[in-house]
UniProtKB/Swiss-Prot annotation:
One of its GO terms (biological process) is response to oxidative stress. Expressed at a low but detectable level in leaves, stems, and flowers, but at a higher level in siliques and even higher in roots. Predominantly expressed in seeds. GO terms for cellular component: chloroplast; cytosol; mitochondrion; plasma membrane. This is Probable phospholipid hydroperoxide glutathione peroxidase 6, mitochondrial. Its EC number is 1.11.1.12. It comes from Arabidopsis thaliana.
Amino acid sequence: MLRSSIRLLYIRRTSPLLRSLSSSSSSSSSKRFDSAKPLFNSHRIISLPISTTGAKLSRSEHSMAASSEPKSLYDFTVKDAKGNDVDLSIYKGKVLLIVNVASQCGLTNSNYTELAQLYEKYKGHGFEILAFPCNQFGNQEPGTNEEIVQFACTRFKAEYPIFDKVDVNGDKAAPVYKFLKSSKGGLFGDGIKWNFAKFLVDKDGNVVDRFAPTTSPLSIEKDVKKLLGVTA
């Protein structure tokens, strides 16, 4: 038995045919392995640029979003009572009092009367009132823009601009009012509570103060004078 095993081993080592077959098999396996190498290399080459490009786009988009954010009241355009665009940058250098008005409110008479008095006294010093009709509080401003302007100008001699009717709260709130509220929040949150809420804006378009609907216009005269630089 031992002799048979030794003889077989000797034949395998010395037989030219067996050595040739073994060498051919080994060479074929090596070639198959070598031919697979470029596949792995090509995968490594094309996988690198993808995430880098994505990162650059993300930074660019973030930069564009940041640059488009409004920085002052002058970045907004609104509609006047006739539907024409008004770029609020025309009020640069003026002190502004922005009010959401209504024609059928319990605060209508006192506010419209005092607004007219305040405007008459300081319009020559660079003071302007911007009135925005709003029907969100008790449906107390139901009329058309034309009716609202006629009411304010005829009954209260309003000479300041009255703009297009807007929403001041909710998803449909005018962008300018979203800016005003975010700049100066109220006592119980940012939302406008009623008709005749007031925002005071300085000569640079910054919102510097906010007053409740029940605050009378003449009671904030000292604040207006301070921003105007009027001492008398």
